[in-house]
Amino acid sequence: MKMMDANEIISFIQKSEKKTPVKVYIKGDLKEVTFPETVQAFVNKKSGVLFGEWSEIKTILDENNKHIVDYVVENDRRNSAIPMLDLKGIKARIEPGAIIRDHVEIGDNAVIMMNATINIGAVIGEGSMIDMNAVLGGRATVGKNCHVGAGAVLAGVIEPPSAKPVIVEDDVVIGANVVVLEGVTVGKGAVVAAGAVVTEDVPPYTVVAGTPARVIKEIDEKTKAKTEIKQELRQLNPEK
């Protein structure tokens, strides 16, 4: 998987068309209303639903107010530069409520739990789990077979573009409510204890804890048993 360069992301945001998409329920004498091709209209003679850009739909509502009796607008963003990732082709388990922006890479058999937030340019390796309410900032990278605990934050780096992003190498376990600051690399097989604030690189196969996080020991068999990654949680339905 290739991490996006910060300047690529900045250019994408700069050049993208800023959108305010809405869903509008309408009621009235709709046979008298003409809808442009740029608006998706699922209507009958008396009611229907519209999908499209707010500026266009507002014009329709204003120009046809004598035919439209009532309407309700659903809107969750304004001048948005980055769409949500199309999840339909992703070979991973993604639970309801996860917010995943476009240009995020998700490896096969990864797991994204409820209310996790994944920003543009982030990379999640095969078989890694991002737990509930965890946040992966822009360009944060998680390797294979990792677990990022509930409420953990991997800080994002888009600006300044020269800054180094968070990199979590393979087989890492990050506990709940951990904060990993910009530029930190968490080495392969390491364990970060719950609640730690990681300000410096974590050596491979070590356990760190505290605020700021410090190495407290090397990985041993007891630690491996307590932080085992269960592949059963990452299995998908067999392809038909």
UniProtKB/Swiss-Prot annotation:
Q: Name one Pfam family in it.
A: Hexapep_2
Give the top-level enzyme category.
transferase
**One record GO biological process:** diaminopimelate biosynthetic process
Q: Which GO terms describe its molecular function?
A: tetrahydrodipicolinate N-acetyltransferase activity
Which controlled-vocabulary keywords does the entry list?
Answer: Acyltransferase, Amino-acid biosynthesis, Diaminopimelate biosynthesis, Lysine biosynthesis, Repeat, Transferase
* Catalysed reactions, as listed in the record: (S)-2,3,4,5-tetrahydrodipicolinate + acetyl-CoA + H2O = L-2-acetamido-6-oxoheptanedioate + CoA
Q: What is its EC number?
A: 2.3.1.89
Which InterPro entries does the UniProt record give?
A: DapH, DapH_N, Hexapep, Hexapep_transf_CS, Trans_hexapeptide_repeat, Trimer_LpxA-like_sf
Q: In which pathway does it act?
A: Amino-acid biosynthesis; L-lysine biosynthesis via DAP pathway; LL-2,6-diaminopimelate from (S)-tetrahydrodipicolinate (acetylase route): step 1/3
Q: Which family does it belong to?
A: Belongs to the transferase hexapeptide repeat family. DapH subfamily.
Q: What does this protein do?
A: Catalyzes the transfer of an acetyl group from acetyl-CoA to tetrahydrodipicolinate.
PANTHER family attached to this UniProt entry: 2,3,4,5-TETRAHYDROPYRIDINE-2,6-DICARBOXYLATE N-ACETYLTRANSFERASE, ACETYLTRANSFERASE
Q: Which NCBIfam families match?
A: DapD_Ac
Per its record, how is this protein called by name? 2,3,4,5-tetrahydropyridine-2,6-dicarboxylate N-acetyltransferase
- What's the gene? dapH
